[in-house]
Amino acid sequence: MHYMLKTYLKLLQQANLVKSCCLYGKKDQIIENLTFDSRETMKRGLFICKGAAFKIDYLRQAFKNGAVCYIGEEHFPLDYEVPYILVKDIRKAMPVLAKQFYEDPSRELDLVGITGTKGKTTTSYYIKAIMDEYQKSIGLRSMGIISSIEVKDGVEHKTSSMTTPESMELYRHMKNAVSSGKHSMVMEVSSQALKYQRVRGLNFDVGVFLNISEDHISPSEHDDFEDYFSAKLSIFRQCQTACINLDSDKADRILQASRLAKSVITFGTGQADRIDGDVKNGRIPDIFGYDIQQEKGRINFRVKSGRFDERFTLGMPGVFNVENALAAIAVAYLYHIPVEYMIAGLKKVKVKGRMEQYVSHKRRLTVIVDYAHNRLSFEKLFQSVLMEHPFSKIVSVFGCPGNKAYNRRRDLGLIAGLYSKKVYLSADDPGEEQFTHISGDIARYVESVGCPYECIENRGDAIKRAIEEAEEESVVLVLGKGCETHQKIGKVSCAYPTDANFVKKYL
């Protein structure tokens, strides 16, 4: 069903977002398309003017392609009169428009949102694996997913360009999920999506908060840790049940914020020494993981809850993945999924670019490709590798992105330097910042802890060198890009063969 232009104007007015408007008699115009991409065909379309780099040429192109009205924060003088609605905040306006245009498909979905500094993607796939096992058994379609790797909504299956899409894309994917017969969807919710209103208006059945650590702090992201943390916590304003990791740093504050939700479920392993209040004094998680063991690339652990006490196995290495699995089990528990489907789903799932392990038995060499790219993920990964490969030397290959998250250069340099026998610094989306500047920043911290390093800008060459120079009984960690297929160099997103392809080529 399509709605008239006046319907969208009224919704924006009700949200107190309208500054002024001039519709030139078009208030009864039926709107059939909604987009912010001027390249799209938009017959009878409503065009959104957004972004610091927006140009009036985009608006001209939009009307050439069929737009009948534009919405933006400022008036653009064209050579001819066109209807417009000016709003106070275009980011707040976009989800209002999208929700109406796509008729709020979230109401017809069991919607799970996941936030946290690390583990969002893996947890998303763990939840999907469990739900798919169960839904297949009762004749339902598989769960939709919106992740930093891909979007699968039952109609579209595409590689993701950002962790959480803009609101109009988000609502379109949910509409696709409903129209294709899906009943559930899991999605990653980034701090940027929360801060910039991309998920505004959504009501999550479950909001999962995995963990928190300093990240994404730069002029183009978050001003400071408080801004970052507050953005993450805001997910609780729009979820029915909060799902909380009691092992996380700042768990006391996370629990306090979770009171905004109607109910709370907790998970963890009892590692609560950093938590204040009743948790530190003995609160047991609702979903309690214990007896964690690693064996031949698999992680075994037990989970105790109000309904079961069972043994689980993860098909992926990485002891830190137990926390992600516990989050997925907690979500499944809320949906009353029988435990046998939880066990089956977690046992078989693997996630692209996450703890992908390649072994040369001839050289007794292991290479692990992982997306770890911030302090928390580096700490967890290096500690896990030491536990799983106690007699091996560690060599690491990584870099940091240009012009953002500057704290990573210090954090990753120090952590990798402390754990590695040698570090190879290479390009990881340098953008418009010089690689020599980025690698120089990181190298200072690697060197400060006495670790040798080498700077090799070409990532494929760096991976090759690390593998060729690694001694027997070594673990080479190739970190930061996971399964990403593009490298941002200058203003261009260049095709990149993936870290895994280079590893398989040179191992």
Language model features: what each stretch is:
Residues 72-73, 88, 147, 189, ...:
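Short loop/edge segments at beta-strand edges and connector loops
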Residues 31-32, 43-44, 67, 81-82, ...:
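Short, well-ordered alpha-helix to beta-strand connector turns
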Residues 1-19, 43-46, 52, 263, ...:
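ATP-dependent carboxylate-amine ligase
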Residues 78-80, 179-180, 206-367, 443-447, ...:
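Acidic, Mg2+-coordinating active-site environments of NTP-dependent enzymes
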Residues 93-246, 250-262, 326, 332, ...:
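Phosphate-binding loop of NTP-binding sites
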Residues 56-72, 84-93, 205-211, 226-230, ...:
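A short, gly/pro- and small-residue-rich
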Residues 77-78, 119, 151-153, 193-195, ...:
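Short, active-site-adjacent cap segments at secondary-structure transitions
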Residues 1-96, 100, 313, 317, ...:
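N-terminal leader/targeting and accessory segments in enzymes
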